[in-house]
Amino acid sequence: MTKTKFNPYQFRKQFKWFKNNPQWVNFDNAATSIALDTVSQACKEYYELFSVNPHNKTPDLNNQIIAIIAETRQLVADWFNVTALEIIFTSSATESINLFAHGLKPWIKPGDEIVLKGDEHSANVLPWVALAKQTKARLVWVEKQANQSLEDTFKSLINPKTKVVAITATSNLFGNSIDFAQIADYLKQVNPKAFVAVDAVQTVQHKQIDIAKTQIDFLAFSTHKFYGPTGLGVAYIKKSLQPQLQPLKLGGDIFTQIDPDNTIHFKSTPLKFEAGTPNIMAIYALNKLLRFFKQKFNFAQMMAYGHQLKQQAYELLNSNPQIVLANHDQDVPIFSFKHRQLATIDLATFLNINKIMVRQGSICVGRYRNKDYFVRVSLMHYNTVKELQYLAKLLATDTKTIIKNVIK
């Protein structure tokens, strides 16, 4: 297959899921995207061809896996324009963020400030709340101002006491993105010793990120939201910071010696952050995934298609007088909304009855837990205009008919 103009129907042929579930429309991609056939085949291939542990360096098969893990680390590094030594494999983006927050603990002093938004995924809120409590740091909450950009609001709260700025690059609830590079530049001017942590979980599948062009210290994402396997997260940690950071998990082969006074000497990075047997199968599958995109599909064209899909989804949703969008500044195709007359659970149930998968609730955003619920539609590159039109048709159903279907 050669690279051509992106065609979603051609792309769908790379997923057996659509053959096995022809009646379903997947609009819950921000939770987990469908895995490429390349990925599922790689998982099977790993167990059939290898199924060995990289910590044994004698057998040839083990050494092949060691080489594949190193190669995958380099492929990820190339994708983000960083060095392989700055890429760490974890179990999830959640673990990655916890790893970095835990590692910063000795650097945070009472009175230091941690700047973050409260209406983001709890994975990029709870670790910082815990860090503040453990270190007696002060949490500074960012509230979007009507007459100010989100970037300027962040910058207005940064001062010499700021030690960490935790940024979610794209909201999993609202689909709007933030220029984290601009905030990082400003923070480093105000306090060069401060840290910028970026949650890019909802960004990497929609935008190309060149970390080398930024001053961020950390970035996290999960492969299962980018057509990849579950159980694998990736953390970028700036190489110059790694020697000072303590690992989150201890064990395995991450150390060189233990002194008589119980001081642990860790191996060189990134191995000291990867205690225990890694998810080798998922790393092997990630290798195949990145090679697939490099060889068979043009990611720039995919991003352009995603932008077009976002525009069409917005127009269809915004034109329905019964639908109230949570915001109107989406940068990626993620939309949260309410129905003027229906509870979100009823609307989501109606869509499920008609074979459309969506998410409903507070969607892992603690601020809205037990307070404010939404229906979320999140798209990927295999979604089509035809699917969006089907959604629009269902949302145009009169309220009485929807309720009648739900209570059957």
Swiss-Prot record:
Organism encoding this protein: Mycoplasma pneumoniae (strain ATCC 29342 / M129 / Subtype 1)
The protein's required cofactors: pyridoxal 5'-phosphate
Gene name in the database record: csd
Protein name, as recorded: Probable cysteine desulfurase
SUPFAM superfamilies: PLP-dependent transferases
Source organism phylogeny: Bacteria, Bacillati, Mycoplasmatota, Mycoplasmoidales, Mycoplasmoidaceae
N6-(pyridoxal phosphate)lysine modification, residue list: K225
Reactions catalysed: (sulfur carrier)-H + L-cysteine = (sulfur carrier)-SH + L-alanine
Documented EC number(s): 2.8.1.7
Pfam families listed in its UniProt record: Aminotran_5
